[in-house]
Amino acid sequence: MKTCLIVDDSRVIRKVSRRILEDLGFEVAEACDGVEAMAWCRAMMPDAILLDWLMPVMDGLEFVRQLRGETGGDAPKVIFCSSETAIERIREALDAGADEYIMKPFDGAIVAGKLGALGLLQERSA
């Protein structure tokens, strides 16, 4: 089973994201900021990371930059999930090492589309 780490300071966003990802067949872990997420990644690198931009302690941009410098940190597919809509900000996230970008609010179809495009969705039998 593929793993996804949800990194967001909003408990509500983490809960909604968890439901979507579990429905897609992922094992899910949660972190409320970049520091907690980095500790989790150092212990067990996930297959995917759903990452908020604006968080206390360490924001998403700093997290992805640090992640990509870690041993094995190039492996996870990082999807930024943010209310930042300016093209310059999206480009900044992708240049920092993110693989995809989703604008909030999002739904299951949007998340599934991005994960599928990144090759992370497994065929599931009914």
Model-found features: residue ranges?
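Receiver (REC) domain active-site loop signature in two-component systems and cognate sites
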Residues: 55
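Acidic, metal-coordinating helix/loop segments flanking the phosphotransfer/catalytic sites
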Residues: 30-48
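Charged docking surfaces used in two-component/phosphorelay signaling
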Residues: 15-23
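Acidic catalytic/metal-coordinating carboxylates
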Residues: 33-36, 59-65
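C-terminal output helix
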Residues: 106-115
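Alpha4 helix (beta4-alpha4-beta5 surface) of REC/receiver domains from two-component response regulators
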Residues: 62, 85-100, 113
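Conserved Asp/Asn-Gly motif in the active-site loop of CheY-like receiver
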Residues: 31-35, 90, 108
